[in-house]
Amino acid sequence: MKLGHIAKAFGAMLLAPLRIRRHPPEAPSDSFHYAIPMLAATKDLAVTQANDFPVAKTSQGRWTEWPPLILAGCDEPLVEGAPDLRGVWQAYKGPLRGHIERVEQAGARVVITAGGIIHDLTAGGIPMTDEGLGGAEINVAARYEDGRLNLYLNNKRLVVTRYREGSDLVWRWGPYRNRLRRLNDPPKNNPPL
């Protein structure tokens, strides 16, 4: 990662709480985003495997409307040790209160869609190179460790952790620790924070 990319990403990270307060993200308006798909009991019984779907990337200029589900129709069960993080989540506690993200999972694959970007990773697979915060190019590897999804910058430095604690999703991103609740319906059915 180039020094300019690091400075750009660091500056964007420090300003993220202010950006979210000034421009609160909108939750997906269509109900299909909120449905948690049924997974097959075993990998052998799965009709579609996670690697049957092409890898998604952040589109040029980022997305402004929630993109379709990347793993729609995939029923491959989660790999052993993977926490079930699937769903649409909103931060209700922490510096990034209001943040909304959609997490899709199947097999070892996890797709995190939020803030105009799409991170499509395979835990234990090759690192993903895509756009990060502030437009900086990032190289990130995913690993399931101790019931957590950990993301490593350049496959070395742990920078993001997601795990379940009761019904909450705990998301640590850089210096920020946030608690998220699962949204089960489009915005008109969810109480404001």
Q: How would you describe each model-predicted region?
A:
Residues 2-99, 105, 183-193:
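Amphipathic/hydrophobic helical signal segments and adjacent flexible N-terminal regions
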Residues 11, 95-137:
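N-terminal glycine/threonine-rich, aromatic-flanked beta-hairpin/loop signature
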Residues 85, 102-110, 122-128, 143-148, ...:
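Short, solvent-exposed coil/turn segments at beta-strand boundaries
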Residues 95-96, 133-136, 144, 154-155, ...:
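Short solvent-exposed loop/turn micro-motifs enriched in small/polar/acidic residues
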Residues 98-101, 117-119, 138-140, 157-161, ...:
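A structural detector for short beta-strand units
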Residues 113-114, 153-155, 162, 173:
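Residue-level recognition of conserved beta-strand positions in structured domain cores
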Residues 138, 149-150:
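Mid-chain, well-packed structural core segment of small domains
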Residues 168-175:
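Short, exposed beta-strand-loop hairpins at the edges of beta-sheets
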